[in-house]
Amino acid sequence: MTRTVLCRKYKQELPGLDRAPYPGPKGEDIFANVSKQAWDEWQKHQTMLINERRLNMMNAEDRKFLQTEMDKFLSGEEYAQAEGYVPPSE
């Protein structure tokens, strides 16, 4: 049976993650309050931000920026986009 969570981003019950994505309290919070759908979308967006903004994960400032944007994204707030990115229309 699939575990469900009240997703912080989508404000509805959705399937949850299989395990915490990070160790510690941050990972536990994401595991308990973020759906698999929201986490998968964040991972795609994170990759786009790293590539388009040429973020260096060895740089503490770049990691802090990405962490802040993850918190915004998963909370349903306004978050940084890659410059010039236009989401595909249906």
Curated annotation (Swiss-Prot):
Superkingdom of the source species: Bacteria
Keywords from the named record: Iron
Residue intervals passing through the bilayer: none
Keyword Iron: yes
GO cellular component assignments: cytosol
Biological processes annotated in GO: cellular response to oxidative stress
Keyword Iron tagged: yes
Signal sequence annotation: none
GO terms assigned for molecular function: iron ion binding
NCBIfam families: PRK05408.1
Family assignment from sequence similarity: Belongs to the Fe(2+)-trafficking protein family.
Job description of the protein: Could be a mediator in iron transactions between iron acquisition and iron-requiring processes, such as synthesis and/or repair of Fe-S clusters in biosynthetic enzymes.
Name of the molecule in the record: Probable Fe(2+)-trafficking protein
Origin species: Ectopseudomonas mendocina (strain ymp) (Pseudomonas mendocina)
